[in-house]
């Protein structure tokens, strides 16, 4: 049951030195990477690999901690750099026991940077740990890496701090949950009078729970539906408010980082 390594690649407008600073400086790295709550570099000799401690908050006041070491390889005259790392944890809440990977930086002729990572790890807790990793943890970790890379891109390109996106993303999730519950309620109530209408409304409720690629289309269609209800003259204020709410949340979704803007498979 060997799993494929996690691979993420993104292109952004930047120069080599700037991107290197944003990713190799621990005080900046922890700001954009969802995988880490804190990164602390330990004292080391110039000829040694840089050792570090990391922490990740997992909720309910709990943290997972681990250690690692990294080394950067670059030539001032080259348009490429790389950074390798090894990491591990003996924390009882950590599903990762040890792993390794690398970051690679490639300066393109069009003034853009290609930033990519690939890493692999071994899990704890035997067969149970491997199944949890396969079904839940690895997909979530891959998504978090990809989302973080796009958050980094927006920070570098537009100077928008990643913490702002995290708050906005939480708000957006609650918006989607609100619309989903709204249509579930409408669907289960409406199915008594019209099975077709009730089923369609329940289907729309399910769509709000899915990570769809072009979800802004649903926002737009829903805003038009609410506006149409308002034109019918019944509870005008409520429908207008819901229409504006739907359009505003759609606009918000277009400004958020997205894992879909990254490449998750290496070119053959």
Swiss-Prot record:
Species the sequence originates in: Bacillus subtilis (strain 168)
- Give the record's GO CC terms: plasma membrane
* Origin: domain of life: Bacteria
Q: Which UniProt keywords apply?
A: Cell membrane, Membrane, Transmembrane, Transmembrane helix
Q: Where is the protein localized? A: Cell membrane
* Segments passing through the bilayer: 169-189, 190-210, 225-245
Q: How does it sit in the membrane?
A: Multi-pass membrane protein
Asked if the Swiss-Prot or TrEMBL record annotates the protein with the keyword Transmembrane helix, the reply is yes
What is the protein name given in its UniProt record? Uncharacterized membrane protein YndG
């Amino acid at each position: 049951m060997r799993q494929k390594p996690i691979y993420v690649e993104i292109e952004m407008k930047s120069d080599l030195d700037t991107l290197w600073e944003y990713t190799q400086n621990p005080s900046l790295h922890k700001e954009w990477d969802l995988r880490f709550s804190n990164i602390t570099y330990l004292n080391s000799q110039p000829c040694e690999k840089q050792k570090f401690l990391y922490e990740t908050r997992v909720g309910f006041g709990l943290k997972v901690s681990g250690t690692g070491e990294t080394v950067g390889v670059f030539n001032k005259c080259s348009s490429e750099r790389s950074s390798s790392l090894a990491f591990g944890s003996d924390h009882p809440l950590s599903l990762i026991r040890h792993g390794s990977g690398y970051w690679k930086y490639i300066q393109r002729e069009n003034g853009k940077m290609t930033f990519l990572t690939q890493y692999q790890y071994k899990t704890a807790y035997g067969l149970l740990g491997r199944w949890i990793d396969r079904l839940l943890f690895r997909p979530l970790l891959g998504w978090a890496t990809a989302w973080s890379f796009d958050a980094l891109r927006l920070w570098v390109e537009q100077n928008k701090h990643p913490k702002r996106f995290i708050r906005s993303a939480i708000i957006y999730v609650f918006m989607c949950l609100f619309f989903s519950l709204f249509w579930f309620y409408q669907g289960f109530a409406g199915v008594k009078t019209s099975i077709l209408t009730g089923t369609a409304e329940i289907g729309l409720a399910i769509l709000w729970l899915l990570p769809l690629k072009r979800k802004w289309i649903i926002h737009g269609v829903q805003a038009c539906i609410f506006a149409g209800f308002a034109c019918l003259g019944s509870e005008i204020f409520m429908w207008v408010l819901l229409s504006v709410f739907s359009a505003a949340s759609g606009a918000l979704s277009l400004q958020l980082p997205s894992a879909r803007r990254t490449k998750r498979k290496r070119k053959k």
